[in-house]
């Protein structure tokens, strides 16, 4: 016997369905459910008197026939769609996206539930892929917990701890340091990959770092990003299938932006903080965002442009790059990098899909726990200032939402050759998933899964009689301890998997090789492949893209900010 219920009652019981709209936290962004893979009247839900009970929504299949975990009635927000579905997890990987239940009595079941299945209630929750931050200065290990609690599940960068070189550059230099960092990676519930130092004009110093296990090489101006170093580094990358990231020559000592672009010779490269405040040819490194072989990203301090952005950056830059405020030349160096015109243009270039990625620049002119927040603050600011995108309607901002979520999920995964494992909610990928209450979307996740196991969550008093009493705060869960850390992976080069020195380290976490980094182009950046011709006026710093002036006002107030934080 069937019964009809109204839309509000249905949404409260099973979460939103097709045509329902939802506001993302306190932003002006609205999503609309595009498709519902569950079957009306056959939805599964756990609890007393609910569906997932023996002989009802739970069948008799043995462990090999059923999911290890099912997230029920989840609202998936990913680059490929905004849909309602059950998510099946098996062996730490996403096994199915569709309809869960008991195939013995229910139609259309793609995810079998049995006695061996755990359930996570996704009703009324948003589920996203774990974030990927590709600009990490590994200055302190506490960054990893901070990032995890913000919804980031993969970190790529370089460093060796609070060393002077690491304060300024994302490089783990040389085989000895690389091996020590690989060993350290075993201790953390985070997918990790390390970048070697790419500043060398001969091949062997770079080749040996790739063989030691780095996933890419970083060219940084503080080590000397000369045309010779760029050319040599990209040559090794082409030979060994790893990515190159670059922080180019702010002072234009060894050439101008045209010189650096010429040294690329059409080869793929990831340009960090492509606007320039984080470093790069002054004042026009932003031009690189229009080239087909350049994969441009931002770091989060300039995201979005606010009334405080300029003032904050000057002090931040002096500290991070070991500059002396008593030396006039050092002050001039800092001031040359901070330009309100290019920072404002960066907002718009993100909104139009010319900048493809977002990252942090952790503790080195960036905040490791704010990649997700700053992404959605930028999207909100652009919605308020520029209105709906042409691809959207008055009803929803679905395309804008897909464009922005791609900036910290699938696009960094594609760029660094790890999209076969992470970066989206798709069958066959690692179950790195983040659950959000809609009112807290983008700012405070509820539950973070690593490889199918809960690694972190909001949790109340451990001595309470129920899980919810205050103080409620983020705590590490069982997926963050002991052998369960193997639900995370360590990314390495293909050459490292063949290296007996790496095998001798006896690393505990699975090693996964990066691949396909050299064939990725700007056109492959999902929802973010626009390649305009960008010009910067050398006198006024006015930015134009295909002749259009890119200018916007700084924000005076933002969502996802003080409303959500005591400190």
UniProtKB/Swiss-Prot annotation:
Kindly give the Pfam families that the UniProt entry links to this protein.
Amidohydro_1, Urease_alpha
Urease domain boundaries: 130-567
Q: EC number(s)?
A: 3.5.1.5
| Biological processes annotated in GO | urea catabolic process
Domain of life from the UniProt record: Bacteria
List cofactor names only.
Answer: Ni cation
Instruction: List positions binding Ni(2+) 2.
Output: 218, 247, 273
Subcellular location(s) per record: Cytoplasm
Q: How is it modified after translation?
A: Carboxylation allows a single lysine to coordinate two nickel ions.
GO MF term list:
nickel cation binding; urease activity
SUPFAM superfamilies under this entry? Composite domain of metallo-dependent hydrolases, Metallo-dependent hydrolases
Q: What class of enzyme is it?
A: hydrolase
Q: How is the cofactor bound?
A: Binds 2 nickel ions per subunit.
Question: What reaction is this protein's catalytic activity?
Answer: urea + 2 H2O + H(+) = hydrogencarbonate + 2 NH4(+)
* Residue numbers annotated as active site: 321
Annotated binding of Ni(2+) 1, by residue = 135, 137, 218, 361
Pathway assigned in UniProt: Nitrogen metabolism; urea degradation; CO(2) and NH(3) from urea (urease route): step 1/1
Q: A single GO CC term, please?
A: cytoplasm
Keywords assigned: Cytoplasm, Hydrolase, Metal-binding, Nickel
Where, in this chain's numbering, is substrate bound?
220
At which residues is N6-carboxylysine found? 218
NCBIfam families per UniProt: PRK13207.1, urease_alph
Please give the family membership noted in the entry: Belongs to the metallo-dependent hydrolases superfamily. Urease alpha subunit family.
| PANTHER family xrefs | UREASE
Assembly and partners are described as:
Heterotrimer of UreA (gamma), UreB (beta) and UreC (alpha) subunits. Three heterotrimers associate to form the active enzyme.
Q: What is this protein called?
A: Urease subunit alpha
């Amino acid at each position: 016997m069937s019964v009809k219920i109204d839309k509000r009652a249905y949404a409260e019981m099973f979460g939103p369905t097709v045509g329902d709209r939802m506001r993302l936290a306190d932003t002006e962004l609205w999503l609309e459910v595009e498709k519902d893979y569950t079957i009306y009247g056959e939805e599964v839900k756990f609890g007393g008197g609910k569906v997932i009970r023996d002989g009802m929504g739970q069948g008799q299949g043995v462990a090999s026939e059923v999911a290890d975990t099912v997230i029920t009635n989840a609202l998936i927000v990913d680059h490929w769609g905004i849909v309602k579905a059950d998510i099946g997890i098996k062996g730490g990987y996403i096994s199915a996206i569709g309809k869960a239940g008991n195939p013995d009595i229910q139609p259309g079941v793609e995810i079998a539930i049995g006695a061996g299945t755990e359930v996570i209630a996704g009703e009324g929750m948003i589920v996203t892929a774990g974030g990927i931050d590709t600009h990490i200065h590994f200055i302190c290990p506490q960054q990893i917990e901070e990032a995890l609690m913000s919804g980031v599940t993969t970190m790529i960068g370089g460093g060796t701890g609070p060393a002077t070189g690491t304060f300024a550059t994302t490089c783990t230099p040389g085989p000895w340091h690389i091996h020590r960092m690989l060993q350290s990676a075993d201790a953390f519930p985070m997918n990790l990959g390390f970048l070697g130092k790419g500043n060398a004009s001969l091949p062997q110093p770079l080749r040996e770092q790739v063989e030691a296990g780095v996933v890419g090489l970083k060219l940084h101006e503080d080590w000397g990003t000369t045309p010779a170093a760029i050319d040599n580094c990209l040559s090794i990358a082409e030979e060994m299938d790893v990515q190159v990231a670059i922080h180019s020559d702010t002072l234009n000592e060894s050439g101008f932006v045209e010189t650096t672009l010429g040294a690329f010779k059409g080869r793929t490269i990831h340009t960090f903080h492509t606007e320039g405040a984080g470093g790069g040819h002054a004042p026009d490194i932003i031009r690189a965002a229009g080239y087909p072989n350049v994969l441009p990203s931002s770091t989060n301090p300039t995201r979005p442009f606010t009334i405080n952005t300029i003032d904050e950056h000057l002090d931040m830059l002096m500290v991070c790059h070991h500059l002396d405020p008593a030396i006039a030349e050092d002050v001039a160096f800092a001031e040359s990098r901070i330009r309100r015109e290019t920072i404002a243009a960066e907002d718009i270039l993100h909104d139009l899909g010319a900048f493809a990625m977002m990252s942090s620049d952790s503790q080195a002119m960036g905040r490791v726990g704010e990649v997700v927040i700053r992404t959605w603050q930028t999207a909100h600011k652009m919605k308020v200032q520029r209105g709906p995108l042409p691809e959207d309607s008055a009803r929803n901002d679905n395309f804008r939402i897909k464009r922005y979520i791609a900036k910290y999920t699938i696009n960094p995964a594609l760029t660094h050759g790890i999209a076969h494992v992470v970066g989206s909610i798709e069958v066959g990928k690692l179950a790195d998933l983040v659950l959000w209450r809609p009112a807290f979307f983008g700012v405070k996740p509820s539950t973070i899964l690593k490889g199918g196991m809960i690694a972190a969550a909001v949790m109340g008093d451990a001595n309470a009689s129920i899980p919810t009493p205050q103080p409620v705060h983020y705590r590490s869960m069982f997926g963050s301890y002991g052998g369960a850390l193997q639900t995370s992976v360590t990314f390495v080069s293909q050459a490292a998997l063949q290296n007996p020195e790496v095998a001798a380290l006896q690393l505990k976490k699975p090693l996964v090789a990066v691949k396909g980094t050299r064939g990725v182009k700007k056109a492959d950046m999902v929802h973010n492949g626009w390649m305009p011709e960008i010009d910067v006026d050398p006198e006024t710093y006015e930015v134009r893209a295909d002749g259009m002036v890119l200018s916007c006002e700084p924000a005076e107030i933002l969502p996802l900010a003080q409303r959500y934080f005591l400190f």
